[in-house]
Swiss-Prot record:
Example GO biological process: glial cell proliferation
Gene: Lgi4
Subcellular location as annotated: Secreted
Protein name: Leucine-rich repeat LGI family member 4
Pfam families: EPTP, LRR_8
EAR repeats: 210-252, 256-298, 302-349, 351-394, 396-439, 441-483, 487-532
Linked pathology: Defects in Lgi4 are the cause of the claw paw (clp) phenotype. Mice are characterized by limb posture abnormalities and peripheral hypomyelination, with no sign of dysmyelination in the CNS.
Keyword terms, alphabetized: Glycoprotein, Leucine-rich repeat, Repeat, Secreted, Signal
Source organism phylogeny: Eukaryota, Metazoa, Chordata, Craniata, Vertebrata
Gene3D superfamilies: Ribonuclease Inhibitor (3.80.10.10)
Length: 537
């Protein structure tokens, strides 16, 4: 609203310009008063001595630099309030509290440093609001909360930076029964001069993810797994130098993880949990001394060894995975010995017994269970050839295909996104790879430099599909899958403290908090907390 428009509006509000002489002391200096209307210009401070029947107040070129909370408590009858050509460093929260009858608020052609998100609180009768031409680059989120009676909002003439700070405004506009004038964006350059109300909120990326260090678990570890038992999340670490499988739980009073139980397992490489109702199994795959199955039949008992697993077959285990076949739980143990073979162990009565030997003489380093085309599949990585994909047919695994252009792959992990299945293939030196299943085979999608990598682990944490590429020589890298691009994008480095020879990652959610465990072979296990940051706030 220009100066002429303001003047006409005030004359109309005054009603035929009827002269009125206010009681002595009721019209402050620098002000012109009528019975129901006042215009003040150039006053060094906010006037207070007004008639209790005052309906409209206009403040022009004031010397006030700050509108404080409760600035208008002595003017409860105001229906219209106008500011123009002023300079405010800040408009504080509750600046207009007490103006429950105010219908028109025009704050126009001013220079405003900042506005509190609670500045307009209490204006329950407000119908017309103008913040036009105030040099504002953004508005605080929730500024209009509680203004249910608004019918007209004018935000034009402000140099809005149309980044994440305006996302809340774009999401708010369709939800109100008010006409909103927004004007054009002043920046960033990609959207400069585009009308703000023409922007698509869905194209804004205003969530940030951060993994911050929380805790250290002293001993080194080769693997880490999460599982839920009796409704409580647990973690189990394979600690070969300590000779144990260490089970951790969350201490709600100390707000950190603490040991709950440990299983004696010298030279252990993997501790794989399986929960069947009240019963808990832990498979301890060991390099020497025989792999064992531990069991707890009820929550009030401790885990005890119940079975030595296939002592003639499991010669040098390197990895163990859990999978379900025809409704029964099975373990697959990848064997890295020269004369060994990967073994499938399935439940039969009280224990787990060999069901099938796979991939003899290939020195397998990793096994990954996955589902493709609605059927169980098994992917084996080995030191001697490209990864081989098996599928479950007629009660056994049969070779289906291998992974092209994937030599020297140490480990494989998979994830799903947007209905597609992706592989993360770990190579120690060179390029680790991301591949996508096309219905008949996996095809190369992306390559990421590896510098001493033994693990390339995908993890779904909250809404973030992450993948962590470990490194023995540098900081481990965290990537996030961007669904619109279909690739992994760098997110952050893990550290400090730096991970020393990371070998496995796992995530767990406890009491609404999300944690990432990093098992390290030459250093302590590190625990990080996952945070979601709203950049539009």
């Amino acid at each position: 609203m220009g100066g002429a428009g303001i003047l006409l509006f005030l004359l109309a509000w005054a009603g035929a310009g009827v002269a009125w002489s206010p009681p002595k002391g009721k019209c402050p200096p620098h002000c012109s008063c009528s019975k129901e209307n006042t215009l003040c210009e150039g006053s060094p401070e906010l006037p207070e001595s007004f008639s209790t029947t005052l309906l409209s107040l206009s403040l022009v070129r004031m010397g006030v630099s700050r509108l404080k909370a409760g600035s208008f408590l002595k003017m409860p009858s105001l229906h219209l309030l106008l500011f123009t050509s002023n300079t405010f460093s800040v408009i504080e929260g509750d600046a207009f509290i007490g103006l429950s009858y105010l219908q028109y608020l025009f704050i126009e052609d001013n220079k405003i440093g900042s506005i509190s998100k609670n500045a307009l609180r209490g204006l329950r009768s407000l119908t017309h609001l103008s913040l036009a031409n105030n040099h504002l680059e953004a508005l605080p989120r929730f500024l209009f909360r509680g203004l249910e009676t608004l019918t007209h909002v004018d935000l034009r003439g402000n140099p809005f930076q149309c980044d994440c700070r305006v996302l809340w405004l774009l999401q708010w506009m369709p939800t109100v029964n008010a006409s909103v004038g927004t004007g054009a964006c002043a920046g960033p350059p990609a959207v400069a001069q585009i009308q703000l109300n023409h922007l698509d909120p869905k194209k804004f990326k205003c969530r940030a993810t951060e993994l911050s260090w929380l805790q250290t678990v002293g001993e080194s570890a080769l693997s880490v797994e999460s599982f839920s038992y009796q409704g409580e999340p647990h973690m189990v670490l394979a600690q070969p130098f300590a000779g144990r499988c260490l089970i951790l739980v969350w201490d709600y009073s100390l707000q950190r993880f603490r040991p709950e139980e440990e299983l004696s397992a010298p030279s252990v490489v993997s501790c794989k949990p399986l929960v069947l109702g009240p019963r808990l199994f832990i498979l301890a795959a060991r390099l020497w001394g025989g792999s064992q199955l531990w069991s707890r039949s009820s929550p009030d008992l401790r885990l005890t060894p119940v079975q030595v697993l296939a002592p003639q077959r499991l010669l040098r285990p390197n990895d163990a995975e859990l999978l379900w076949l025809d409704g029964q739980p099975c373990f697959v143990v990848a064997d890295a010995s020269k004369a060994g073979s990967t073994t499938l162990l399935c439940r039969d009565g009280p224990g787990f017994y060999p069901r099938q030997s796979l991939h003899a003489w290939h020195r397998d380093t990793d096994a990954e269970a996955l589902e493709l085309d609605g059927r169980p599949h098994l992917l084996l990585a080995s030191a001697s050839q490209r990864p081989v994909l098996f599928h479950w047919v007629g009660g056994r695994f049969e070779r289906r295909t291998d992974i092209p252009e994937a030599e020297d792959v140490y480990a494989t992990k998979h994830f799903q996104a947007g209905g597609d299945v992706f592989l993360c293939l770990t190579r120690y030196i060179g390029d680790s790879m991301v591949m996508r299943w096309d219905g008949s085979m996996f095809r190369l999608l992306q390559q990421l430099p590896s510098r001493g990598s033994h693990v390339f682990q995908p993890l779904l944490i909250a809404r973030d599909q992450l993948a962590i590429l470990g490194s023995d020589f540098a900081f481990s890298q965290v990537f996030r899958f961007e669904s619109d691009k279909g690739i992994l994008e760098p997110l952050q480095e893990l550290g400090p403290p730096a991970l020393v020879a990371p070998r496995a990652f796992a995530q767990v959610t406890v009491a609404g908090r999300r944690f990432l465990f990093a098992a390290c072979f030459k250093g302590p296990t590190q625990i990080y907390q996952h945070h979601e940051l709203d950049l539009s706030a």
